């Protein structure tokens, strides 16, 4: 019997799963995590050029999942950025220019689980860099903290509309 059940404190059975790149385990973990959402996917991203992650987010929108992205304002203007394309795919997008760089890289699904790590949502992170990604489930306080931070970033950021000239 778990100690928490005996002591009348809430039980938390956390699971932490790690993925690494190059090699695909980080990307696969992120794709599986984003695809598992039933109600919401909230993404904070410094750089966003990954076609597979963009496709996973667009597929979530198509399934009726609410998807929001806060991206770094300067990086979102890069030639290969998919930020505008995501807005055109139905993702609610905002850009944040409040900091030297908005360097976050995390996803919160359904307000209850978190993916975080060094992995930018880019092709380079997948194929050229040594990166990591962690998925944390069963830790409601951790998820609450990340959701609160996402909401703070969202509220201070500027909306992005679909722009046909920036669709990739």
Placement of each model-derived feature along the sequence:
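Solvent-exposed loop/turn segments at secondary-structure junctions
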Residues: 47-51, 73-77, 99-102, 113-114, ...
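Sec-dependent signal peptide recognition
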Residues: 1-3
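N-terminal signal peptide c-region/cleavage motif recognized by signal peptidases
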Residues: 9-10
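Structural recognition of the beta-strand scaffold that forms the well-ordered cores
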Residues: 42-44, 68-71, 94-95, 107-108, ...
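Extracellular/periplasmic catalytic domains that process cell-envelope and extracellular macromolecules
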Residues: 35, 62, 86-87, 100-102, ...
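Primarily the HKD phosphodiesterase
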Residues: 32-92
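Signature of lipid phosphatidyltransferase scaffolds
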Residues: 109, 113-168
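Short N-terminal segments immediately surrounding and downstream of signal-peptide cleavage
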Residues: 14-38
């Amino acid at each position: 019997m778990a100690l928490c059940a005996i002591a009348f404190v809430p039980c938390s059975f956390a699971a932490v799963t790690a993925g690494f790149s190059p090699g695909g385990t980080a990307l696969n973990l992120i794709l599986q995590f984003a695809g598992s959402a039933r109600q919401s996917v909230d993404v904070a991203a410094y750089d966003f050029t990954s076609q597979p992650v963009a496709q996973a987010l667009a597929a979530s929108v198509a399934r009726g999942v609410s998807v929001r992205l806060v991206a770094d304002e300067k990086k979102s203007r890069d030639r290969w950025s998919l930020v505008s394309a995501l807005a055109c795919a139905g993702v609610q997008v905002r850009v944040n220019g409040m900091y030297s760089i908005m360097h976050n890289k995390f996803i919160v699904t359904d307000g209850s689980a978190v993916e975080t790590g060094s992995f930018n949502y880019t092709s380079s992170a997948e194929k050229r860099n040594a990166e990591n990604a962690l998925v944390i489930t069963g830790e409601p306080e951790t998820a609450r903290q990340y959701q609160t931070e996402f909401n703070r970033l969202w509220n201070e950021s500027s909306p992005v509309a679909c722009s046909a000239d920036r669709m990739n």
